[in-house]
Amino acid sequence: MKRRKKALCALALCLLLIAAVFLLGLGGAQKTWEDLPYTLLEFEGGRAIDLAQGGSYGEMNRGPGLTLPAGEYRLKWAIDGDGDNVIRITSGNGAAANPAEIPVTAGSGEGSCLFTLDRAAENVQIRVDFASGTRIDVRDMRLYSPMYRDGAFAFALLAAGAYALYVLHLYGRLGPKARGRLILVGMAVLIASGPALKNTIGIGHDTTFHLVRLCNLADGLAHGQFPVRAGGYAFNGYGAITSVFYPDVFLYIPAMMMNLGASLPFAVNAFFVAVNALSAAAMYVSAKRIFREEWAAVCASILYTLSIYRISDVFTRYAFGEMTAMVFLPLFLLGLYEVVWGEKRSWPLLGASAACIFLSHMLSTVICALTAVGVCALFIVRIIREGRILPIAKACAAAGLLCAFQLVPFITYSLEGIGAQELAKDPAFYALHPAQLFLLGAGELSGDPADWRLSTFALEIGLPLIMGAGIALYAAAAREAADTQTKKKDGFAVLLVCAGVLFAVMATTLFPWSHVRVLTRGLSDYLQFPWRFLMMTAALFALAGGYGLAVYARGHGEQMAAAVLAVAALCALPTLTDEARNNHFIAFGETVSPNWQYTEYTLPGTKTAATLDPGVRADEGVELAQVERDGLAFRAQVRAADGGEIALPLFGYDGYRAELDGQALAWTAGEDNRLTVKLPAGADGELRVYFAGKALWRAAEGVSLLTAAGLAAMALLRKRKESGADKR
């Protein structure tokens, strides 16, 4: 009880300090673009123009060409002139600045003005228009971003980490040996997080796609959706339903951080660090539970955290979904182990981890499902003999019910013909040559040599994992005498290595992908890249390697773990260094362009170029007044004596509702797939259009919520029973 009181007091103090930092406005950061006339503005005729020397009127410059998030900005200038001139602010995607024109009066010299961007603006132009007088000289111009709260969030995260360590210490979980193990694993996390410890986001393979997903999610949250189905950031405000087809449950935290004042680079980099830390923790817990050996858990955690495929997922591919799925992959393997070989009452772990993987990345779910089916088929006799079919069925049911809130909208839109068919690829074309698995760093790949993404990043198992797996085999083969439990551990480690080898083979040209494509009638194309199977190889080899290295250490676990850390870090650092030095990035104060060109998960026939028109179109005879927009919602006063149509700058996805003074109106996806409202004759009142979703979706959300609550209650009751048994 005393420990609980101390923990609660520490929690209260931690929350109080965090609240104080935010309320006092501490830790703010602002981006300043200084000396714009000398850096980002291009003056065709020079910064100074004199009519007496042959100069002429007109816009003097172009630039800075920034992509800026919505918000309030301050512009300062020092412009000498004897006439009244104008600074004009525009964007390349139709986002409006208010005011869009700033007067510069004769003889004013220096001045400043606040302006607001109503939404994210691509290719922002701040142009000086020499409109009157005989001379002008643009001496200086500076742009100030909104104030971001990155420092406050950094303090909050550090305070939360310190509190977690204090609680572990308070409950006796952080003794001298535990501290040593934590330091070694923490070093692996720190090294793996190197490229995230800066205020920029490197541009990788899928950076743009996933950052727009994140910003779209943040927009949906900011405008009251929960869970988010559609957001109004993508496609220049026309909206996207990526949250339905690409689960983003675990992106809610960085999205909420952004809505509370964090910059995009800070939120994303904090997410990457969290992914690394949680991946390390998940592998540690799983290896310790399976092998009952602390140093096996430490070595496995280090191997997994610094595995080259996982690191490439984070910092080369920027594969938000797959990297998040790899957080839960060790827990999935642990759950599968328990249900098939261990404590079959642990089926909730298998169900919950499978659900978390699905809610991270659907393709990773397919790989995990294939793994589970293969294991069950291989050990079907054992499963039937020991009565393990029911726990497996319960795990499957739990996973399905937990994901119902995501599955039901997904199925709804899929039945309407929305999907990502254009992303399907022939897996045989992208299979690796076997030699690639044994390289260090980027190597030559099969496929189109013009595809730079496939020729400039590491697609391999990695030396540390290969050595770990090899030593696991050696430890099992060279052991002369062992008890039954040790033999079981050795056998399971060998099984893990064999499974990892199989998945590695599936990533290469050795696997008959052409035949698989025929047998599955093209369904295998949705896997896109066979080298995705290396994610499973990394997890399996890390588990087996951690155990083998701990056995091979022969009582010198500390030294072995330190050696594993050194070797794994040395093999990972070349890739980490390249990514940290990436000179293509999104800087602090900037954002990703909302002018999205991807057409997956859109209505058939969508043309992204049409989204550059942000205007509302109305038929002749339809009067509009007081038009207001809030995310994906529109309000306006309308009058149409003879009826008519209004086309809004929104894609007409199923789930919108149109009302005139509270009465439902019909709408359709019209020209350019715009949401087009049909007004009846004599319409006169307030038009309201908003994304409401469907009642069936709400029912599915209730099912998932009740399932999660039930599993949590089961876990709590089980823990209390075990605690009571220990006391007796």
Positions of predicted regions on the chain:
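Membrane-embedded transmembrane-helix bundle of lipid-linked glycan/lipid transferases
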Residues: 2-27, 144-583, 689-728
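Glycan-recognition and processing domains
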Residues: 6-72, 90, 95-99, 132-134, ...
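Extra-cytoplasmic beta-strand recognition segments
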Residues: 62-83, 113, 141, 658
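Active-site-proximal, structured, solvent-exposed surfaces of multi-pass membrane proteins
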Residues: 69, 610-728
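Extended, low-complexity, turn-rich repeat/linker tracts enriched in Gly/Pro/Ser/Thr and Asp/Glu
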Residues: 79-87, 132-135, 654-655
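Extracellular carbohydrate recognition and processing domains
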Residues: 94-121
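Short beta-strand-plus-loop segments that form exposed binding edges in beta-rich domains
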Residues: 126-134, 691-693
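Extracytoplasmic
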Residues: 191-194, 214, 218, 568-625, ...
